[in-house]
Structures are given as C-alpha cells and as structure tokens.
Amino acid sequence: MFVKVCGVKSLEELEIVEKYADATGVVVNSKSKRNVPLDAAREIISSAKIPVFLVSTMKNREDWEVAIERTEARYIQIHSDVEPSLLPYLKDEYGVEIMKAFRVPQESENPERDAQMLLKKIRKYEADLILLDTGAGSGKMHDLRVTRIVAEEIPVVVAGGLKPENVEMVIKLVKPFGVDVSSGVERNGKKDEELVREFVRRAKNVVR
C-alpha cells in the first residue's frame, strides 16, 4: 500500500513524515492554507529522503515550467483542468512523474454513471498516478461507491477526509493502489507524529 502524507510546510514536518510515509507533497501557487513559497518548496524537496510531489492548482504551462525549474521537482501533482497535452510535454521537457487529481462528488445519485464519466475523463491524460479526491483540500470524504468502481478499472490513490480512524475501512472498500492524507494527520494545523505513525501503520496493515 502506497501511503502519501501531503502538505508539509517545513523541514520539521518533513522530518516527521519521511520516517513513516512513502511520499509527501508540498503545495505551491495555491490558495491552500498549506501553501509555501517556491524557495521553501525547493528546500524541502532537496532535503527529502522520500519523493516530494510539487502540488498545485496552476493551469498554465508557463507557471508549471517556472515552478519545476525553481524547485527542481521530480514529481508533480496537478489539481486543475489542464489540457491533456500538458502532461506529455512536462514529462518530455523535465522528466517529471505526474500524479493527476480528479474530483469525485461527495454524494452520487448514480455511482456507475459517474464512475464511467470519470474514467472517460481520466483516460485522456497520460499520468503516472491517478488521485481521486473530494477537492480543494476540503478534509471531507467523497462518494466511495464511485471511487470503488474506478479502482476496479485502474490503479488509484484515494484522498479526501482520510484519518487513522477510517483509513482501514476505505482501503477494504475501495481496494486502491494507495492513500493520501493531509489534514487527517494534523493537530493545530501541523503534522503530528503520533497521527502520522498511526495512519501509516493502519494503512500498511490492512488485509484485503
């Protein structure tokens, strides 16, 4: 089980996360409360012992180019409706691995229909990893019935409302490739070592 703990804002948080998680993420050029300047992101990326995804809602190719060049990121996570052609371009130009995020509704009236629509959209993008999220770092869970159907077709990373108390249930239900957490392992707005450790332990120990 691939476990990513996203939204580190400092070297102190990175030190906690990289003890336990397979990957982390640093948010730039976004309205997120976890947003950090590009120079800070570069320092986190260069100091890390695990992969650090450069996470952003940027839409323009030029903005992604500047961010990748300034931070020397090798992994990026796109949370916007960019043109599908951007992904192969960034891969060819910078050699980055790309996680593309897609939003899943919190409640679906027709999970099968919504899953098929989502799969059609996902297949337009040449991403290395697919993230299914509730969107905008909401800390809320989406309709897992949709995610489960998508996960039967392609490997997905699940995010949105995850925490130590529910990660086992989500993994057993959805059977994803991985899970991604941010606010669910924070206390007072900072990554908490006890919560990070417990989240990773529970995620890794699930028998599917």
Curated annotation (Swiss-Prot):
**Which reactions appear under catalytic activity for this entry?**
N-(5-phospho-beta-D-ribosyl)anthranilate = 1-(2-carboxyphenylamino)-1-deoxy-D-ribulose 5-phosphate
SUPFAM superfamilies given in the database record: Ribulose-phoshate binding barrel
Q: Which Pfam families match?
A: PRAI
According to the UniProt entry, where is the signal peptide? none
**Which top-level group of life is the source organism from?**
Archaea
Q: What is its EC number?
A: 5.3.1.24
Q: Which pathway?
A: Amino-acid biosynthesis; L-tryptophan biosynthesis; L-tryptophan from chorismate: step 3/5
Asked if Amino-acid biosynthesis is a keyword of the record, the answer is yes
**Keyword Isomerase belongs to the record:** yes
* Alphabetized HAMAP family for the sequence: PRAI
Question: NCBIfam families, alphabetically?
Answer: PRK01222.2-4
Q: Under what name is this protein listed?
A: N-(5'-phosphoribosyl)anthranilate isomerase
Q: Which organism is it from?
A: Pyrococcus abyssi (strain GE5 / Orsay)
Q: Write the gene name.
A: trpF
